[in-house]
Amino acid sequence: MGTILKGMSRVRWHELTHAYGSAVGVPGRLSRVAWGDARTSASALSDLGLWLGELAVFDATVETVPSLWDLAVTDSVTNRSGVIKLLQTILEHANPPEIEVQQAAHRAVLDGRSVADVLARDEDAAVRAAAGELVAAIDSHVCESCCPSA
């Protein structure tokens, strides 16, 4: 793997799950986002969205978020705005049976707030727009697992 996704090889993907089972396919999809053309990247992001965020969040989601932040700031990635939108999707979804997983996934997105601020000033208008929406979502984020009532 290249320098963009260098930390990905340390993750034990075969031990993690996503919405449809084993997460062994996640690194390949992340690589397609990193180095694929627009069509390949969009297809890979669609898969990642279904697997990691649209239905619920999973342990594989938690491990994927740092790579998504990495992709979002890499100019050579063809669909950075799509990556940013996936981060927002992850922040907006839950996994009630596994509150700790939900909290960790949300925290991984929330911890990238300063990166989202930088992206909100990006030269690419689509990246700026997606990042602006993500910043707003981060700033207004309240969920039971992240902000338990006292």
Residue ranges and their predicted role:
Residues G36-D37, S41, D75-V77, E123-D124:
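Short inter-helical turns and helix N-cap capping residues of alpha-solenoid HEAT/ARM repeat scaffolds
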Residues D59-L68, I99-L110, C147-S149:
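Short sequence/structural elements of tandem HEAT/ARM alpha-solenoid repeats
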Residues S41, T61, R80-V83, R128:
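Residue-level detector of extended alpha-helical repeat arrays and alpha-solenoid scaffolds
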